[in-house]
Amino acid sequence: MAPTTGPRNTKNAKPAVQRSKTLKRKRGQEELSSLIQRVEGLDLKESFESFSDLPLSEPTLSGLTSSHFKTLTDIQSRAISHALKGRDVLGAAKTGSGKTLAFLVPVLENLYRRQWAEHDGLGALILSPTRELAIQIFEVLRKIGRYHTFSAGLVIGGKSLREEQERLGRMNILVCTPGRMLQHLDQTALFDTYNLQMLVLDEADRILDLGFQQTVDAIVGHLPKERQTLLFSATQTKKVSDLARLSLRDPEYVAVHETASTATPAKLQQHYVIAPLPQKLDILWSFIRSNLKSKTMVFFSSGKQVRFVYESFRHMQPGIPLMHLHGRQKQGGRLDIMTNFSQAKHCVLFSTDVAARGLDFPAVDWVIQMDCPEDADTYIHRVGRTARYGRDGRAVLFLDPSEEEGMLKRLEQKKVPIEKINIKANKQQSIKDQLQNMCFKDPELKYIGQKAFISYVKSVYIQKDKEIFKLKELKLDEFASSLGLPGAPRIKFIKGDDTKQRKNAPRAAAHLSSDDEAGSDAEEGEPKTKKKEEPQVRTKYDRMFERRNQDVLAEHYSKLINDDGTMVAPPNAGAGADADEDDDFLSVKRRFDVGDETLGMSSDDSDEEDDDDDETSPKKETKVVHIDGKEALVIDSKRREKLLKSKKKLLKFKGKGTKLVYDDEGNAHEVYELEDEDQFKARGDAKEQKAKFLEEEAERTRLADLEDKEIAKQKRREKKEKRKARERELLAEAEDEEETVVQLPPYEGDHDMDGGFSASEEEEEAARPSKKPKVKFAEPDESDKGSEPWYKKSKRTDDKGGSQAPQIQTLEDLESLASGLLG
């Protein structure tokens, strides 16, 4: 038997658990106080080499160790110590130097030392200029903060706003983009930032520029002023206005590479190529074909260019995977592209500046800048996608000859070393003919190419640095031809300067220039006056014939350019031109109303009369049409004038129609004609009229029945006569088809002594064919006279006895039949 156990002492177990919790809480308080003392005694001038040298909490150190972060970079060593002390920091370092950890570690530590919990609200807010960078920051935060008890959230566009609103009030750390954050601050009722401790701006110079200025100012207005602010970027701003907007308090500027000879990583090889605008795509195609075993990023100025180059190169199949990334894509697709490009070994990514800042793509070999960046800072961020964390990298910048001098001057001011290289002409391949062929076959690709051309020209036009971007020196017609387009699309804003000149020009000069442009019309003495065309009334039939495909071949596509370089006129313009041509033949010179006194007048008299009318009556009389059953219809618009041509629409302006019936005398009466009460009473009592009406109706019904019966009887009689006539016709046809029986001529030939046929007759008998002719019918025998016809007898025999009479074909058959009948 198993030993019996006594009752458990529950009274002693509960205090033991309480004592362990108390000891654990006490030990945690001691560690926290020790950590606070270490932070307060931290020497800011001291250099640190590893994370373990810093006064960090155990959960943070465990997360860093699990994520394989051990050694500190220069920016991390200097910025983390200042941030742990609670100071505002402006951090500037080269791309790929580890700025993300430089602000994430202080965020975790400062909240940990304050014993931040879920109910304390939002403690840290991290702003990022792009969604991709926000996602990357959030992933790093999850890795190093896995052992903390904080709740962190990612708030970016492209996701459900309601789901974010439900969870936002429980978050301690938020990584977000400015636009979505401001939306929650304005619309989410339970979201409050009164207890915010830290504000972090990654890529601060981009967030503080004109693109995010109003949004960031609105966000800062919702935040408390007593907070710690951290700003990090590869190209940090020092503007007093920007720093004042964020309410920085004696910020510490940490620029670890300020004294360095270059602003870019040391292992980054930077080159530029003089590539005329029409030859850029040829050079890019040749480069991709020559580097199929590398990982390349290609930057463009606009998303339309990215899409056009991706679609066209994808059809030509260069032999390497192609991807494209721009801001117009859905958030899920952008994440998939980022993941696939990060995992790929050999790939080409066409992108806009959405991927130029902060994104960490591993092992990028080449960074190609097809279009000149807007400034040197953008160039630094673009080339920063390669040569990260001490790796090798190469960057190539394509410059038009008009952009070379100004861009090199800007790069020199930023300490960017760059060398010029030349392209071997024998290795350059032209893809102009292929692009033209694809644009001819695929109208959608042609449309994308036109949009790419327009977006590039706009991006050059809006640039502020006119020393670099000189729009008038670009060969736009040749550039459009290199894209495969039949001509350069017209862009309105290019003529902005000419518009200003025309506006400021004297009116006399403008009048003279307009007279010169009039040409032959002015010489013929016809004054050229411009009148605003009134919009024509378009019916549903006009819309039906003007209907077009609802794809990219819409009206705005056809307006871009014709193949001959002229603008495409709107649909109504063509219709009006055709109408003008048609009016030249049999056009109405003048319309006369009924009773017009000028109908018989000559042209001169009528002209004089018109002049008098114009002087006396300044207003044109309104046409009025009188319609039966309704009030007059006033024709005061073209729509009302077209209304007269539609019978269906005129029905509502007319009275209700009446249907008439005519009696035997030809008098018209309505279908349902009612009589007065006096007329009804004059004909007698109502009961008598009722009885009389029933008698009349009964008599009328009886007569109608007799007539119907006679008609039915006549129809049956006619049907019977037709049937008998048909039988007689069939019998006559049967008699006509009967054939007479063949009778042999009397025998006259010689015969032998035995009474048989001679030898010649036997030979003739043997020579007869074996098949005998058919005889369908035979003549009746003499013995059958007075009896039934033979064909009836045979038919009756067949019906009763089931045996059919033998068919008579020859004389022997007839004799055998006769002998059988005779007995």
Swiss-Prot record:
Protein keywords: ATP-binding, Helicase, Hydrolase, Nucleotide-binding, Nucleus, Ribosome biogenesis, RNA-binding, rRNA processing
Ranges of Polar residues composition bias in the record: 1-12
Domain Helicase C-terminal, chain residue ranges per copy: 280-439
EC number: 3.6.4.13
GO molecular function, one term: identical protein binding
Chain positions of motif DEAD box: 202-205
Residues involved in ATP binding: 93-100
Compartments where located: Nucleus, Nucleolus
Region listing for Disordered, in residue ranges: 1-30, 494-545, 563-625, 702-823
Regions of compositional bias (Acidic residues) in chain numbering: 515-524, 604-615
Assembly and binders: Interacts with the U3 and U14 snoRNAs. Associates with pre-ribosomal complexes.
Protein name per the record: ATP-dependent RNA helicase dbp4
Name of the encoding gene: dbp4
